[in-house]
C-alpha cells in the first residue's frame, strides 16, 4: 500500500494558494484539497492465484477507484484480510476497503468525511466536512472581519476549489453546517474557545 497521510509541504507558493500540491489548492495542514487529498496505490507485490490471502482481497489490476477512502480505512482492511475479529466494544473509525480495492462500489459506505482542527494550525481554527460532491469549510475564528465563516465548493465540478458557492447555494451551505455540527456532536468533539473562555460551536448564520 502506497499513500501519504497529508498533502505536500514543500515551501512553494502561498499556503492556501497553488504550490507544492498543485493543481490542488493548499498544502499540508490547510483546509483545502491540497492538504488532504493524496494518491493511494494498492497492489500485491507478487500476485499468486493460489494464495488464500490474495483470494480474500482480489485487487483489480489497472483499475481506478473514485469512491471516497481515508487513511483510517487501512487498519480495518488489514484486520479483515488477516481474518481478525474485532471485539464488539472496540471502536474503529475506518471502513473495510476490500470491495473498493476489488474495483466495486461499497454502497454501505457513507459518502462523508470530517476533518476537525479546534486548535491553531497554520493560523486557522477550522472544520472541513465533505458530503458527496460537496465540501464545506467552516472557520471558528476568521482571521479578518471580511473573511466569511463558511466556504462551499463542489469538488466534482471544481476539484481545484476556485469557485466558492456559499452565496449561490445558501440552502446547501446551511444543510452542510447542520450535518457537520451533528457529526461533531456524535464524535464528542472539542471546540475552540474565545478570549473569555466560551466554547465556539458551529452555528448556521445565514
Indicate where each model-derived feature is located:
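C-terminal cap/loop subdomain of S1 sulfatases and analogous C-terminal strand-loop tails that border
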Residues: 8-31, 48-53, 57-63, 67, ...
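Short beta-strand-to-turn element immediately C-terminal to the catalytic PLP-Schiff-base lysine
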Residues: 41-43
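Ligand-binding/active-site lining segments
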Residues: 34
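Catalytic cores of eukaryotic secretory-pathway lumenal/extracellular enzymes that build
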Residues: 37-38
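Generic enzyme active-site microenvironment
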Residues: 3-4
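Long, internal low-complexity/basic segments
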Residues: 74, 131, 141-149, 155-206
Amino acid at each position: 500500500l502506497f499513500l501519504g497521510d497529508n498533502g505536500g509541504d514543500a515551501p512553494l507558493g502561498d499556503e492556501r494558494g497553488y504550490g507544492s500540491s498543485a493543481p490542488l489548492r493548499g498544502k499540508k495542514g490547510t483546509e483545502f484539497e491540497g492538504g488532504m487529498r493524496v494518491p493511494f496505490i494498492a497492489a500485491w507485490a507478487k500476485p499468486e492465484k493460489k494464495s488464500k490471502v490474495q483470494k480474500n482481497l482480489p485487487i483489480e489490476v489497472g483499475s481506478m477507484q473514485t469512491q471516497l477512502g481515508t487513511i483510517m480505512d487501512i487498519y480495518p482492511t488489514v484486520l479483515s484480510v488477516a481474518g481478525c475479529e474485532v471485539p464488539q466494544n472496540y471502536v474503529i473509525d475506518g471502513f473495510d476497503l476490500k470491495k473498493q480495492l476489488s474495483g466495486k462500489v461499497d454502497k454501505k459506505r457513507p459518502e462523508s468525511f470530517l476533518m476537525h482542527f479546534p486548535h491553531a494550525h497554520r493560523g486557522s481554527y477550522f472544520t472541513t466536512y465533505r458530503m458527496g460532491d460537496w465540501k464545506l469549510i467552516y472557520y471558528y475564528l476568521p482571521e479578518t472581519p471580511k473573511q466569511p465563516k463558511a466556504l462551499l465548493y463542489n469538488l466534482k465540478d471544481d476539484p481545484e476549489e476556485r469557485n466558492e458557492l456559499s452565496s449561490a447555494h445558501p440552502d446547501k451551505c446551511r444543510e452542510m453546517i447542520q450535518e457537520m455540527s451533528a457529526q461533531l456532536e456524535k464524535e464528542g468533539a472539542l471546540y475552540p474557545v474565545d478570549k473569555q473562555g466560551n466554547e465556539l460551536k458551529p452555528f448556521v448564520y445565514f
